[in-house]
Amino acid sequence: MKISFLLLLAIVICSIGWTEAQFTNVSCSASSQCWPVCEKLFGTYRGKCMNSKCRCYS
């Protein structure tokens, strides 16, 4: 049972699309500051502030 759980967990982790997030060097303190940056750079308003840097999602 434990092996099947670990196998399922490994499959889920491997199937996550890591390339969907785009990192930027733009400093931020709130996610709302990233929305215009993401629109300008990647054409999408979906973004958030992580570790004081904007991260945009496609």
Swiss-Prot record:
Signal sequence, renumbered to the chain: 1-21
Subcellular location: Secreted
Residues the record marks as site: Aromatic residue of the functional dyad: Y57
Major location (coarse): secreted
PROSITE patterns in the cross-refs: SCORP_SHORT_TOXIN
Domain of life according to the entry: Eukaryota
InterPro entries xref list: Scorpion_toxin-like_sf, Scorpion_toxinS_K_inh
Disulfide bonds: C28-C49, C34-C54, C38-C56
Record-listed Pyrrolidone carboxylic acid modification sites: Q22
Annotated tissue distribution: Expressed by the venom gland.
GO molecular function, one term: toxin activity
Pfam families recorded: Toxin_2
Keywords: Calcium-activated potassium channel impairing toxin, Disulfide bond, Ion channel impairing toxin, Neurotoxin, Potassium channel impairing toxin, Pyrrolidone carboxylic acid, Secreted, Signal, Toxin, Voltage-gated potassium channel impairing toxin
Positions bearing the site annotation: Basic residue of the functional dyad: K48
Record-level GO cellular component terms: extracellular region
Domain notes from UniProt: Has the structural arrangement of an alpha-helix connected to a beta-sheet by disulfide bonds (CSalpha/beta).
Role played: Potent blocker of both large-conductance calcium-activated potassium channels (KCa1.1/KCNMA1) and voltage-gated potassium channels (Kv1.3/KCNA3 and ERG1/Kv11.1/KCNH2).
Family: Belongs to the short scorpion toxin superfamily. Potassium channel inhibitor family. Alpha-KTx 01 subfamily.
The protein, known as: Potassium channel toxin alpha-KTx BmKcug1a
Organism of origin: Olivierus martensii (Manchurian scorpion)
